[in-house]
Structures are given as C-alpha cells and as structure tokens.
C-alpha cells in the first residue's frame, strides 16, 4: 500500500496547484443515508491522483481503526473528518474539499444523508452549481432522495447527476438501472432542473468515476469526472444588475468613510450612479477600494469597500444597487420555506429574519401550501396550517421594517434568508423569496415615491373640498383686511396702539364669523354638472 502511495506523489502536486485561471465548479453529493456519498468523493480524489501523501497515510491508519471495508481502504474516511463521523460511519457535518484537474477547479461539499441533518445538506446546496444525487441500486428512489431533490431544486441548483451506486450488488443489471432512471425522471419533471444525467457506478471500486466502466458496456455516457469537467454552468451574477448589500460602515478615521460588502451581482466603477435602498436615494460612487489599492472596477464575487461622492446616511443592512434595475423594497414576502427544527412552525409568532446583513422582526402570517415529497408538487393548505420538521412549504411573511431584496430565482445572494427563533437563537428555517410587496400598496416605494404620496395625501382632500377651502380663505382674508384697517384708524386718531390692537382683533373675529355664516347658509350652492354617459378619457392612472 505504501508503495502505491509513493507512486502517486509526482503527478498530484501540479494538479493541486494548477487551477489559477480555470473555471470553478461547485458541486455537492447528497441522497439517502448509506448510499455512498463520502465513498464516492474519496475514491474520486484517489483515482484522479488528487489526494496528498499525508492524507493517504492517514487514510491507511484510519481504515484499520474505523474502516468498514475489511482489509481494503475505506475511502469515505478521506472526507469524514469528525471523530463522531469516523466512529459511527456516517456523515454529520458538511465537508468541503478543494481540487483541480487540467480543465477545471472544483469545490465539493459532502453532505449528510440522515434526516436529522437535513439543515447541513441545505447549507451545501445553497452555493452549489451541480448536485450529485446518490441512489442505492438495491433500494431505488427513497423519501430522503426525493427530499434532497426538492431542496436542491429549491436552492436553484439546475444540473443534477443521478449516480446509481452499488451496481455490483445487482449484478450490473441494465434493467434495474433503467427503472431507477425512469422513476427519477418521472418524479423530477415538476422540478426546475435544466439537465439530468443518470450514470451507473460502483463508488468503492472506482467504476465509472474517473475512467469508463468495463463491466457496464451498455452505458454509453461519460464517467463522472469527465461530465463534471465539461458541464456548462453559466455565471449569471456577472451579467445581473448591480447588487451590493452593505455589511459594514468602514470609518477608520475622520478622513475616510466607506461601505464594505460583497458584490452579489453585476459590476461597479467609480462614477457610476447607485441607488441606496430602502431609502431610495441616488448618489455616485467615488472609489472602489481594496486592501491592495483602488480598483478601476469591481465585479460580482469580490469583496470591496465603496466610497460615495456625497455624505449620505447608509447603514449596515442597506443595499446599493443599479438605479435602472433596482432591487425590490417591501415588508411583505411570499417565500418558500424549509423548516429545520423539531418544534413546528407557529403562525403569527415573531421570528428574526436575516437576509444578507439585514435583520428585522418577521411574522409568518399564513402557510399557503406544503410541498409533497412524493410528487414534488405544492398542495394547498387550510388557514392555520403549519410546517413540521424538514417540511417544505410556501408562506406569507410580514416584516417589521422595509427591506431590499430580489426574488431568489433572480439572485441567490439577495433572495435567500433565514428565520431565527428569538428565544432559543436556533436557525428555525431557511427561505427563498418569491415575491415582494409593500403594506403601502407598492412593490418598491422609495423616497421619491413617498414624497409624491405625501403630496397626494394633502392635495386630494383639498381638491375634494375646494368650495369649502376657498370659502374659508375668503373669510379669513376679508376679516384680516378689516382688522388691519380698524387698527390703523384707531391708532392714528386715538394715539393708543394697545387699544387699537384690541379693537382690531375683536373686529377681525366678528367679521370672520359673520362672513362664514353668509357663505355657509345664505349663499346659494352651485348646481353640480349633470351626469353624462360618456366614458372619460384614458389617463393611465392606476397602472
């Protein structure tokens, strides 16, 4: 065994350090318990000469202590790093591994299959481009397989590999493989996968992982690693509208005030106009600052500090975005929710909602539907319904404050949130924004919107009561004119300004009352215009 380890060393070193200018692919392994997820990753790294010498030496030692493969190496131990994982032979936490081939860089997340660790699987899915869904050829599609499929689709993973593992235990049967393939395709037709690749394999033997299978000649597709190197995944955040959630107000001294964060979409240059949400004010970017100096531009995926041309109030949790395609602003959300704790969701209970760096109180007002794991479809629920542990539903949320966000389908970074129990501080749920609305009746109110609304609020009542308003104005003007005239006469002839003021005030009050009575009761009201059957001209109001 040690000799085999030594021969792998020369070819591994350049591979591990040769990924500087290559495209990056993030993928996860998921599926039901004991389907071989960790074994698949460990064997893939081993066969591709991507496991370092010290890792292999540790693997030999751990295989003797905790291995489940007899005298053979237990490749799952290359990935399962926690003591509890090694002792129990299961995956508990998400394990990340980084490697590169001649064609691509990879970050793989090995996620647990046990039901109680679904929250950890969701963490891995939240950033993945591709999901490798392990299926035991003997058992077929299980409930946890379906649940993980729904979760990966929910988190925006668009490419899935169905790895039908342990084919040696069904005598490499094509019939068994085809049935599992058809079962999954029938189930997944309602999910939002762009591509589904189904491949047979034996992970512990490395069959169809790096090299094509010699025992299943009926399978014509590429081995797993070849597929991963070639799958086309678009980075839509680079062409998306600019999004910049502010994580920190950077004020190291009196001469510098910047706003630090992660560019979640688009790009930014000095001189670009940005909109600050939820306030809705526009300003101009002065500098794009990093530790290594100023940049000519910042792009999606970079952490930078932006300075603005004006001294404007911007706080942690605010968002700087494109004024042409701004994020939505609102305090009402429709969202998909994955419930993560044993205690059921409580309707009308207040939780903390965290989206980016923004934290606000949120109440789940209704649970509108539950995703049925057997079908992947949403089933409507009665009012007052709730969600149990690991259930997925569609819910309506009311927020305490306005937030800026996007539908999750448009931007993962600005459309995903978590709900935190205010008593236990547990992460109770993870959610994906579907739609955003405002209790003010608009989907994205800004300062400009609110100023117009306030003007309309004053102008509309005044217009509706125009005759009364005009009458009152005439009354006050008439009375004031009389009072001023009386003051002038008395002051000039009586030489007593104090007495003149008292007489003028008394006269002003009396004249106001008399004139108002005249306008209100003696003057004939205007005859309203006769109704007409003509349709008023279209103005576009209300669109």
Please describe what each predicted stretch is.
Residues 2-27, 35-38, 101-102, 253-469, ...:
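C-terminal effector/interaction modules appended to NTPase cores
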Residues 10-116, 128:
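P-loop NTPase switch module centered on the Walker A-proximal segment
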Residues 35, 46-47, 114-115, 138-142, ...:
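Conserved nucleotide-binding/hydrolysis micro-motifs of P-loop NTPases
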Residues 66-69, 80-92, 187-196, 229-242, ...:
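Active-site phosphate-binding and catalytic loops of NTP-dependent enzymes
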Residues 104-106, 111-117, 125-149, 153-178:
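Conserved Switch II/interswitch segment of TRAFAC-class P-loop GTPases
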Residues 170-236:
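Canonical P-loop GTPase G-domain recognition
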Residues 204, 221-257, 275, 282, ...:
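Accessory interdomain/linker segments of ATP-dependent helicases and helicase-like nucleic-acid enzymes
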Residues 441-543:
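Juxtamembrane/disordered regions of integral membrane proteins
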